[in-house]
């Protein structure tokens, strides 16, 4: 386990999946879910080279079929620590024989965590080291504790969105998205009350860059933690029915397949492409408020 800290925050990150494990403020208050396997055994997994699911867990490159687990393999793969300073950690995953079995590309994936005051910058960097174009998706899945909620009790949370009436998608058809099912989420000037039933049909998904900022509010109605992101999609999730006291806010460069999708990997919705030698970099920001 690696650690970085400043006068406001302390982070712990595991080399397994380059996964953020803990966010504590100067008073020792924890903001990130503890990974209790009774509810959900992760904290903040990195999603790569796909986000969410494939139709029948299968995709095609030039007609050849491959399989990948939901959210890809990065979250369960050991990364190497390649950089450490007082305020920044960088982990890297380079393709190998094992990754190439189900993802036939050469790549270098780097995940960095940088502290800046009360902010955590989570930085994704993908480099194409192949001699051909590569395709990929990437995303985050951090789980934040909801103020006032406890394990074993029904989860209720108040969120603040920067869009008062975004349109949601439904990803509940074999783990993939029903292309026809859409619904406007009504809020009170961006204030959105959620509970476990909100996620009865899996994550609430907003695409087309409708939402760029989400806050979890505390019991006084003030921001507790805020995420800012530039991704075209974001998922909001809680494991409904488990009485788990957290909400995941998931910025995504990618989405599940459409239900019944049987096309080529390159034709997936929200697919990212890199030419040989090119690289992709983006970040999202976690702001610890109160």
What are these model-predicted stretches?
Residues 1-61, 65-69, 210-231, 278-288:
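Beta-strand-rich N-terminal accessory domains
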Residues 4, 95-149:
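Acidic, contiguous internal or C-terminal segments within carbohydrate-active enzymes
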Residues 9, 71, 76-83, 187-269:
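Acidic/His-leaning functional-site neighborhoods
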Residues 65-117:
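Extended, loop-rich substrate-binding clefts of extracytoplasmic carbohydrate-active enzymes
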Residues 82-89, 114-119, 148, 153, ...:
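A short, structured loop/turn motif at beta-sheet edges
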Residues 92-98, 252-254, 287:
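Generic short beta-strand segments
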Residues 110-112, 269-274:
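Beta-strand-rich interaction surfaces with strong enrichment in secreted/lumenal proteins
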Residues 133-135, 143-146, 150-229:
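Active-site/ligand-binding surface loops and adjacent short beta/alpha elements
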